[in-house]
Curated annotation (Swiss-Prot):
It comes from the Bacteria. The keyword Manganese does not apply. Part of the ABC transporter complex NodIJ involved in the export of the nodulation factors (Nod factors), the bacterial signal molecules that induce symbiosis and subsequent nodulation induction. Nod factors are LCO (lipo-chitin oligosaccharide), a modified beta-1,4-linked N-acetylglucosamine oligosaccharide. This subunit encodes the transporter. PANTHER family: NODULATION PROTEIN J (PTHR43229:SF2). Pfam families: ABC2_membrane. One of its GO terms (biological process) is oligosaccharide transport. GO terms for molecular function: ABC-type transporter activity. This is Nodulation protein J. It is found in: Cell inner membrane. Belongs to the ABC-2 integral membrane protein family. Lipooligosaccharide exporter (TC 3.A.1.102) subfamily. Its main location: membrane. Residues 33-259 form the ABC transmembrane type-2 domain.
Length: 262
């Protein structure tokens, strides 16, 4: 990996807003369909698995399985919304539409563009996660005031997965390789991170792996708060999410700089 030059880093505190605004204006035209698409999978899990398995499993950790599952789906929806925005929409803007190339002819640096794309992906993640949170509160699976606490965590989750996905987008030569990331990383992470069943049901080896997954840290922050329980190890989980935001960001900058100059 090459050295990240200062020209590739963000050139100002707010230059990325131009990229965010451009994506927002384009998204407004398809906003209803986009929101419904982000809600579809989590709602299927909540009503499908929650209603079906909830009857058989009863309570999980002192709460109904539906409430347990719904809290996990808040984090999961943020992960999927951010990931899909970055590995597909951002990848298309970078490679097919050549939107990035046009932006680089302005005063924006590569860092400004990447930061703006990540912020936009986190915005979509926040919308998706908050929407699921509102549904869970409406169904009395969580308290309304818990949404105030979990919203920043949803945003951090969106940034973390946007940063990770940006590395994938920088490395992928075609859309086919993006599917590998979705199938081999995102889907297993959904299963292993405690979104649909407690991680205590996993083997000790898999539990150790779970502690390294960003989705697991997000769920460990969101679920207790939504269920009215104390949140243990807040600093650890927040630090892990911040690490997943910062390190992949600089890695993606270096990879994208090399890719775009070839």
């Amino acid at each position: 990996m090459g050295r990240v030059s200062t020209e590739a880093l963000p050139s100002g505190l707010l230059n990325w807003v131009a990229v965010w605004r451009r994506n927002f204006l384009a998204w407004k035209k398809v906003a209803p369909a986009s929101l419904l698409g982000n809600l579809a999978d989590p709602m299927i899990y909540i009503f499908g698995l929650g209603s079906g398995l909830g009857v058989m499993l009863g309570n999980v950790g002192g709460v109904s399985y539906s409430a347990f599952l719904a809290a996990g789906m808040v984090a999961t929806s943020a992960m999927t919304a951010s990931t899909f925005e970055t590995i597909y929409a951002t990848f298309a803007r970078m490679r097919d539409h050549r939107t990035w190339e046009a932006m680089l002819y302005t005063k924006l640096t590569l860092g400004d563009i990447v930061l703006g794309e990540m912020a936009w992906a986190a915005t979509k993640a926040s919308l998706a996660g908050t929407a699921i949170g509102i549904v869970t509160a409406t169904l009395a699976y969580s308290e309304w005031d818990s949404l105030i606490y979990v919203f920043p965590v949803i945003a951090l989750t969106g940034l973390a997965f946007a940063s990770l996905s940006m590395v994938v987008a920088a490395l992928a030569p075609s859309y086919d390789y993006l599917v590998f990331y979705q199938s081999l990383v995102i889907t297993p992470m959904l299963v292993l991170s405690g979104s649909v069943f407690p991680v205590e049901q996993l083997s000790p080896m898999l539990q150790r792996i779970t502690h390294l997954l960003p989705l697991a840290h997000s769920i460990d922050l969101i679920r207790p708060a939504m269920l009215g329980h104390p949140v243990p190890d807040i600093t650890l989980h927040l630090g892990a999410l911040c690490l997943y935001i910062v390190l992949p960001f600089f890695v993606s900058i270096a990879l994208l700089r090399r890719r775009l100059t070839q």
